[in-house]
């Protein structure tokens, strides 16, 4: 028996550890360091309809217990990813999750339709934390009706299961989760970054050229755990948790809260071997805590009895 195996819609994960989108590129650099086949899955960098060059620099700023970033979805475009990036990933025995972003519902549909056809891709991660240019820049992920409609449209064209990535920058993440579940989402990934800002006191101006950025790292882990805990109690679809995971106990914490798998983001910048180390450390820590199978503890923080997927 594989004590770490997690089976989710479209995904047969040998373990629950997945590098998060935007923090692992397309795996090329990390593949020079270790065999990516050890990973449960890989969430690759976001794909948009056309190539994007990203925001002006500086794009990254350090913050206490975390970092701010405003990369701006830099990527070679969906056709560039399909032609240049996905072939490289075919050699690895791991589940590839394609992150899809856009500025209009039509762009999301187009990107999803194209990338979900590729046999390398096993699932879609729908990044709804993007501004809708047709709605005055309001983010898809901050309005339940808009998020639900986008989910429905993407589901209608996707050949693979769709996991919706939820933003914490909302009044009620529970309401958002329920809305996209009712619209047909196969799963959730959460949480995305918190919006933040840093100011250079020598100039009185924001450090980031974009002024604001997404806060990630250990500073946001308690927020992520609380939101996973709240959402897991009201949805029936699985959750891939993320937000500030730096060590093996952080992984267990998110699973206790209700996540089925855990994505690792900022920690990859601090320690490029972190995912490999977590996979090694997880069964050892489970032995110490008397945990037989990783799914035995899912949702136990709120007393739920959740069956093994």
Curated annotation (Swiss-Prot):
Pathway: Pyrimidine metabolism; UMP biosynthesis via de novo pathway; orotate from (S)-dihydroorotate (NAD(+) route): step 1/1
Alphabetical list of Pfam families matching this protein: DHO_dh
CDD domains named among the record's database cross-references: DHOD_1B_like
GO cellular component terms, semicolon-separated: cytoplasm
Active site annotation, chain numbering: 130
EC number: 1.3.1.14
Binding-site positions, substrate: 45, 69-73, 127, 192-193
Cofactors (names): FMN
Compartments, as annotated in UniProt: Cytoplasm
Primary localization class, coarse: cytoplasm
Reaction catalysed by this enzyme: (S)-dihydroorotate + NAD(+) = orotate + NADH + H(+)
Sequence similarity: Belongs to the dihydroorotate dehydrogenase family. Type 1 subfamily.
Name of this protein: Dihydroorotate dehydrogenase B (NAD(+)), catalytic subunit
